[in-house]
Design a protein with these regions (language model features):
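A short His-aromatic
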Residues: 108-109
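Conserved N-terminal segment of class I S-adenosyl-L-methionine
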Residues: 1-103, 112-124, 135, 139, ...
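A short, hydrophobic C-terminal helix/tail in secreted or cell-surface proteins
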Residues: 215-221
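Alpha/beta-hydrolase-fold catalytic nucleophile elbow
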Residues: 132
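Short glycine-centered segments of the SAM/dcSAM-binding site in methyltransferase folds
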Residues: 127-128
Length: 221
């Protein structure tokens, strides 16, 4: 199965992924760390580990999950921290972390394996989960499962996680401030906002964040 993913996600995909997403990680990851007061993260679908590399620079313990070995030559963290696993099969490991996140990965998982993906997010009982997912109508390479937000919310609630709107709103606020004040690298503004407020984290593809039902008392205000 790994060979199938290697054919879909070739070398160019990971080069482009770094160029498109690293500026966003550099801008948002420190803010997320401070807001949630977290010490460890697990990235589901980490690609080159570029988000992980930023969290690591800010002192967090990091680990990740990626589906293809084509990512390894581009990996920005120690590859020993990355689990190579195709989510067409259930992921069996548990990670003791404060935050599980998954940025623009859900749409790459075929619908029949979506529950494997959700289990890979929730099985660790982390206090917080943050994900973004492409909705119907959004193009993109390897997009097999374009769903509206409610689809993922229902699956996460079935696993004991409730929506955490405060963090969603905070991320949107950070992105809008960046756009209005240019308080972010130009590369971030190009990728995240697209100039008209409808980019990855500034409009139609809102982040979806969750807090574990058993962790409500620790939710920051």
């Amino acid at each position: 199965m790994e060979s199938v993913l290697n054919e879909i996600y070739e070398d160019w995909f990971f080069r482009d992924n770094i160029a498109d997403s690293l500026p966003m990680a550099k801008y948002l990851a420190p803010k997320i760390k401070e807001y949630l007061n977290i010490n460890s993260v697990f990235d589901v679908g980490c690609a080159t580990g570029h988000w992980l590399s930023v969290y690591e620079e800010h002192g967090l313990d990091v680990s990740g999950l990626e589906g293809t070995t084509n990512s390894i030559p581009h990996m920005m963290v120690d590859s020993s921290k990355i689990n190579i696993h195709d989510l067409r099969e259930p992921y069996q490991k548990n990670h003791d972390v404060d935050l599980v996140y998954s940025i623009e990965v859900a749409e790459h998982i075929e619908p029949e394996f979506a529950d494997n993906y959700v289990d890979a997010l929730t099985r660790h009982d982390a206090p917080y989960i943050l994900m973004t997912a492409a909705p119907p109508g959004q193009g993109g390479h390897g997009h097999f499962n374009l769903q509206y937000k409610a689809y993922w919310i229902d699956k996460m609630q079935a696993k004991g996680y409730s929506i955490y709107e405060e963090l969603e709103d905070k991320i949107i606020e950070w992105c809008k401030i960046a756009r209005e004040t240019s308080n972010a690298p130009s590369e971030f503004l190009r990728v995240a906002v697209d100039g008209d407020g409808t980019g990855l984290l500034a409009g139609q593809v809102r982040p979806v964040s969750y807090t574990h039902l058993r962790a409500h008392e620790t939710t920051p205000h």
